[in-house]
Each structure stands twice: as structure tokens, then as C-alpha cells.
A protein has these predicted regions:
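Conserved NTPase motor "head" modules and their coupling/switch loops across ABC/AAA+ ATPases, GTPases
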Residues: 1-33, 47, 174-184, 188-313, ...
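Nucleotide-state sensing region of NTPase/ATPase domains
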Residues: 46-131, 135-147, 201-206, 241, ...
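Hydrophobic/aromatic beta-strand patches that form the interior of the parallel beta-sheet core
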Residues: 115, 342, 360-362
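Walker B catalytic acidic pair
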Residues: 317-319
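Glycine-centered positions in the ABC transporter ATPase nucleotide-binding domain
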Residues: 100, 365-367
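Conserved lysine of the Walker
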Residues: 38
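Long, charged N-terminal accessory/stalk domains
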Residues: 123-124, 130-176, 180, 188
């Protein structure tokens, strides 16, 4: 199964009054100065493939100069199918559509997944744990509707339980029902996270070794529930996590009431990168950290293809300027030639003549 993004059109969106972009099945390079709207087009592609944006905009922020309605349309083609994805934003509200029929964000996910790589991602290793959890969950939500449901349900449970904990009249007896709900959702989410991270970890290890020969990198999951049991049966693991989370919630109840926040569960877990057995967050050089992130993105591409049976749409937003020549070349080699890719740049000098010959280059604004 192979799907491609064929045609993107926007109206009253961000910096554009109107714009249409025909995409190559291989590489499309959007070249132009800063503020030409290149990143806005990357965001539009991400919105209609993942149902979300790395900018987390309000509906009003999508509308060009406040004059709506904002409309974004993306045509997907492949295997004899044509699918039209859409998004509209007006009066502070936004809605998605699929073949003209209104749908939720989930309705545009999973058809053609997308993998975004932008400069903000380069700090993923050294930033807080929430950044790495979000990277894993955002990717998982594209691959599985069940994953998306679990992440959403668990997030609501945490928010509502935290609201209860902040009340001055909250006591242990009131937490029982909430503890059961959050433990059920949390244990199921944990199992899904571990399965996805296990898929990603092997590709991260391989890709890192190919870029930085002689060094070994790994990525592991550290749970607030303690050491995870080495079991292959997912139901057995979920049962263990449920019981352990109930016990941990009870153990920390007094402190949680005092602090007004839930202290254990997947929302507090850590995803740890290591290089040569040492914490990458603490000891890795900037170059090593960037190679880890590069390897993570290569892994996302590989896992998306494995799980969904179609190569994802790769979105590279001005990231080439942040990588040195060796890492730029290594990244593009690891991705391969059969991945539909959209790249933004202010400088075509970052690319080889061979890539420029194969790519469709779209000039936006002044020639660069």
C-alpha cells in the first residue's frame, strides 16, 4: 500500500490569502527567505496527515489577517484511491473533513502518517521528560486509534484527579474511584508505550551506529512504578501495572493531597537515551545529542512503514541548516529514496547536485 500527498491548497490561512502547491512523489524543496510562508505549508501538511500541529494553534491563529473562513485541502492518492482531507477554521472554531464529510481529527490520521523534523526537535534529548513523552505519544496516536483513545482518556483522568486534589476538602476516601479509573487507563497506556518504544529502539540503535560508528546508543523507558517485569504477555504486564499503580497511588495519597498533583503514572515517566551506557542528557555532546534525535526520526519513518504498510510523508522544516554536512548526508542516506519528502530551506547550497536534480524545487519569495 502506497499513498502520496498530491496537492495542497490553502485559502485565508496564516500568511496566505490563497496558495496551491503540487507535490512531487519524491522530494519537494520549498526554497526562500524567512517569513515566506514555508513553515506554514509544513504545518498545513502536518495538520491534514496527523490531525495536529507542532505549533498547537488556536483556530483564530490559523485565519489570515482575521478574515475567514480559513480552508486547507490536501489530496491523497494511491492504490487506486483518491482521498480529500480538509480543515476549516472560522469564528474561533475549526473542523476536519474527509471526502467532504465532517470528521474529527482522528478521521484524518492513519491514512498517510507524517514525520516532522524541525529545529525545536534537536533539543529533545536535553529538555524535560514531558518533551520526550509527547514525542512518543504524538507518534503513537498517528499509528493507532486505540493508542490515541488511551492517551486522551488518561490525560483527562489526570486533569480531573488533579482538580480534585487541589480542593481543600479532598481526602483519601474521595480518591478511590478516581484511582481505579486512572490506574486502568494508565496501565493500558503504559503497555502501548512500551510496545511502541520497543519498535523504535532497535531502529534508533542501528541508525545511530551507522552515523557514529564505534558508538552504541540505546533508548529505554523508566516508569514511576519501578522496575518493569520482563514479561512478553501484554495482558500480564497490564495487570501488573494496574495493581502496582493502585498501590503507588495509595502510598502517595497524603503527599498528593498536600501538593495538589498526581505524582505517579505514565504522565511522570521518563524516556532515557544513553550513549556508551551513559545518560545522553547529562553527558552527551551536542553532536551526539543531535545524532540521537536524527536517529529517532529515522526510526519513526521505519516504524510507520512497518505498522501501517505505507511510507510516511517526511516533513523537514529548516532542519538542514542546523546539521553539519556529515549529518545532513547521513540522514538523507538513512531515509532512502522512496520516502515522499518536503523540505524547507533558505539556502539550496545545503543540498547535493544529485538531490537538486531529482527534486522539485519551489521558489517562494526571493530566490535563494
Amino acid at each position: 500500500m502506497t499513498m502520496f500527498a498530491r496537492d495542497l491548497s490553502v485559502a485565508h490561512y496564516r500568511s496566505f490569502d490563497s496558495y496551491r502547491l503540487a507535490l512531487d512523489e519524491g522530494v519537494t524543496i520549498l526554497a526562500g527567505p524567512n517569513a515566506a510562508g514555508k513553515t506554514n505549508l509544513i504545518e498545513a501538511l502536518q495538520l491534514l496527515t496527523s490531525g495536529a500541529s507542532f505549533r498547537h494553534p488556536t483556530a483564530a491563529e490559523l485565519v489570515h489577517d482575521g478574515v475567514g473562513p480559513c480552508k486547507i485541502e490536501l489530496r491523497l492518492e494511491g492504490d487506486g484511491r483518491v482521498l480529500d482531507m480538509g480543515l476549516s477554521a472560522e469564528d474561533g472554531k475549526r473542523s476536519f473533513s474527509r471526502n467532504g464529510k465532517r470528521c474529527s481529527a482522528a478521521g484524518v490520521r492513519g491514512i498517510l502518517p507524517s514525520v516532522l523534523f524541525c529545529p525545536d526537535h534537536l533539543d529533545m534529548v536535553k529538555r524535560g521528560a514531558s518533551v520526550r513523552r509527547a514525542a512518543l505519544d504524538d507518534f503513537g496516536m498517528q499509528l493507532s486509534a486505540r493508542y490515541a483513545d488511551l492517551a486522551s482518556t488518561y490525560g483527562r483522568c489526570v486533569t480531573q484527579r488533579n482538580a480534585l486534589l487541589k480542593e481543600t476538602w479532598c481526602c483519601r476516601e474521595m480518591l478511590g474511584a478516581w484511582n481505579d479509573s486512572i490506574a486502568r487507563a494508565g496501565s493500558a497506556l503504559l503497555v502501548h508505550r512500551l510496545a511502541l518504544l520497543d519498535r523504535l529502539a532497535g531502529h534508533v540503535h542501528t541508525a545511530y551506529g551507522q552515523v557514529a560508528s564505534g558508538e552504541a546508543a540505546n533508548v529505554t523507558y523508566a516508569s514511576t512504578l519501578g522496575d518493569l517485569p520482563q514479561v512478553e504477555d501484554r495482558e500480564e504486564l497490564k495487570g501488573w501495572a494496574y495493581e502496582r499503580m493502585l498501590a503507588a497511588l495509595d502510598e502517595h495519597a497524603d503527599e498528593e493531597i498536600r501538593r495538589g498533583v498526581t505524582l505517579v503514572g505514565p504522565h511522570r515517566d521518563e524516556i532515557e537515551f544513553t550513549v556508551a551506557g551513559r545518560s545522553a542528557r547529562s553527558f552527551a555532546s551536542q553532536g551526539q545529542q543531535r545524532t540521537l534525535v536524527l536517529s529517532w526520526k529515522v526510526a519513526e519513518v521505519a516504524v510507520a512503514r512497518d505498522v501501517l504498510g505505507t511510507a510516511p510523508l517526511l516533513l523537514l522544516d529548516d532542519v538542514m541548516s542546523e546539521l553539519d554536512g556529515d549529518r545532513r548526508g547521513a540522514f538523507l542516506r538513512l531515509i532512502g529514496d522512496d520516502i515522499q519528502t518536503v523540505i524547507t530551506t533558505t539556502n539550496l547550497g545545503y543540498f547535493t547536485d544529485d538531490l537538486l536534480d531529482r527534486a522539485k524545487v519551489v521558489s517562494m519569495g526571493e530566490t535563494c
